[in-house]
Amino acid sequence: MINKRVLINSDSWTLLTDKTSLIQFNGDAYMYINDVAVVSADSVGFTMAKGEKYVSSTNGVYVYGKSASGADVHSVTVSEV
């Protein structure tokens, strides 16, 4: 298992993982899921609260994150299998 912390900000989507993983949000954020490695400018994500977790159960599914609280930088903890 690989554990990593990914910094996200409010300006653009950041790729969190494309592996089977457990993702924990360390600040209020948006999450976007896609089956291709492309995010359009008008993509809308799910609202995720600080401490909320998401399980990505399939390799090849791209999970992106973006901060929901202005320009503050937040992080996401990702544990990839």
Model-derived segments and spans:
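Short intrinsically disordered terminal tails
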Residues: 1, 80-81
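Surface-exposed ligand/attachment interfaces on beta-rich extracellular proteins
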Residues: 1-19
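Beta-sandwich interaction modules
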Residues: 14, 47-58
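Noncatalytic modules at the cell exterior or secretory-pathway interfaces
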Residues: 18-23, 56-71
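Short, surface-exposed beta-strand/strand-loop-strand elements in extracellular ectodomains
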Residues: 26-42
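Edge beta-strands of jelly-roll/beta-sandwich modules across compartments, strongly enriched
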Residues: 31-33, 69-79
